[in-house]
Structures are given as structure tokens and as C-alpha cells.
């Protein structure tokens, strides 16, 4: 090596390779990081699998052993027991049916179908029909359809109830009304809004009891229910301004015609023979021994029977 070159490079090239120049700590760290993979060239020892007992965890050396866990039985929630539902109560899903708006829509349909007396329409709007049918039928309570109430009997369609009451009233103020066939009590409840006193007879004892239960929450003071034969009527309370019969016979019993006041009106379905259509019939008593009959609409009712059960 020349003198000038020796001054510039005091160490031989071999020495530079054997003793590399040290650098600051950060550079050393960088070299260490770069050199780290070389150290990893040697495969690490793989620990042999250790058979563990069920439920025991293998802990690293120097770690305090944890207390064995206590096995807990899974908590199974008890199913909620359904609350009993009253026979005439509307289900929760039918809550909207209890609103006045639903009854108002029913009244709008009645008005569109020809019912014009505002007292009848107000009475139909005031009585909650869903309280008089079984809970399973509550969603149909305000449809214009007859519904079963048990014992092979039905609650009449709202349009038929309104039509019969309007015919019986004929624009008059009713004092005393007789209903034959209480059923579930719905028509009697409507009549109580347009008459001073309502007398209603039911021949089927379970329906008579059911009507009392249905009417009790409404606290209707002017309805008098009777258990007996409707074909006989109620002579002790006669004469009546109006009589409404909610069952169809071959004719109207003479006993009921005799209990109608002069000027009074009786409304009943007539014609119960097999294959014979029933016709809604209006009978007016014009004198002591004279009645006038008008045959009106085709209808369908359960038969009018005698006796009690």
C-alpha cells in the first residue's frame, strides 16, 4: 500500500472484514433485528404433547395453579304459565277491536245499508259486541256476520239487530219492550239504549246465566232477564210497546200477539219448515182483535222452540 493510501486507510482490508466498525445503539439494534432470522434458522424444539386429564388445564412453569372449577348445571328458564282468559274476554291481539273507532266503522256500514234512525245507530255504537262472543271469535265481532254462542244458538248479525230494532221503534219512544231469545244478551243491551224497560226471556239455562255475566260489567239497570218459555211470553209485564223475537217459528204464537199493546209492533222471522225461506215479518196491532202483517226481508234464524232446557 502506498504511503498516501496508508494514510487514508490505516487498516488493511482483511482487518476491516474481521473487525467491523461499531455503531451507535440504534444501529446495533437494527443489526440485531436483521440478524435475528439467522438465529431462527435452527428449528426450535417442539414440546412433546402431554396427556391432560379432563377438566385440568396445563399451566406454564412458575404459575400458581388455579383452583379447579366447579361444574355448574345449566340454568333452564321455566316457561311462563299463561294467565287464564275469561270466556268472554277479547285476546290481547284484538285490543284494537275494543276502540270506539272500530264500532264507528260498523255503524258507518249500517248507515250505508239503510239504517237511518240516529238512536239505533248510537245504541249500536255504544254496545261493545266483542264482550258477548267467545274470545276466539273476538276478531270477527264487528263483522256483519252471525256467530255461534253455543247450544246450537247464534248472535245475530249487526245489520239484522239494527234492522229489527228500527222496525220495532218506527220513530217512537219505547217504554216497555219484550225480547224472546236472550241468547248472549247483546240485543238486549242494544235495546236498553232505546227503551225505558227491557224484558228478555231465554229458555236455555246456560245461555241465561251467560247473558247475566255478559251484562253485569255494563251495569245496565233497565234490563230484566227471565228464564222460561219464550212462546208463552211474559203476561205479568204486558202490554208491550214492542216485541222482538230472535228465533223463527212457523207462525207467531197467539200469546205474544195478545201481549202487544194497541199501536205496538212485533218483529219476528217467520217460516221454519225445511226448505222454506224465513221472512222477517212486521205485525202491528191496530185494534183489540185486529193485527196487520207486513212481510219484508229474507233472513235466517235458529228455530223457535217451546219449553225450557
UniProtKB/Swiss-Prot annotation:
Transmembrane segments: none
Family according to the record: Belongs to the methyltransferase superfamily. L-isoaspartyl/D-aspartyl protein methyltransferase family.
Record: active site: 156
Biological-process GO terms, alphabetical: methylation; protein modification process; protein repair
Subcellular location, record wording: Cytoplasm
Any one GO CC term of the record: cytoplasm
Role: Catalyzes the methyl esterification of L-isoaspartyl residues in peptides and proteins that result from spontaneous decomposition of normal L-aspartyl and L-asparaginyl residues. It plays a role in the repair and/or degradation of damaged proteins.
Basic and acidic residues bias (residue ranges): 14-32
Region annotation Disordered: where it falls in the sequence: 1-46
Organism lineage string: Bacteria, Pseudomonadati, Pseudomonadota, Betaproteobacteria, Burkholderiales
Record's compositionally biased regions (Low complexity): 33-46
GO MF assignments: protein-L-isoaspartate (D-aspartate) O-methyltransferase activity
Record bears the keyword Membrane: no
Keywords per UniProt: Cytoplasm, Methyltransferase, S-adenosyl-L-methionine, Transferase
PROSITE patterns linked: PCMT
Swiss-Prot/TrEMBL catalytic activity: [protein]-L-isoaspartate + S-adenosyl-L-methionine = [protein]-L-isoaspartate alpha-methyl ester + S-adenosyl-L-homocysteine
Protein name per UniProt: Protein-L-isoaspartate O-methyltransferase
A Pfam family of this chain: PCMT
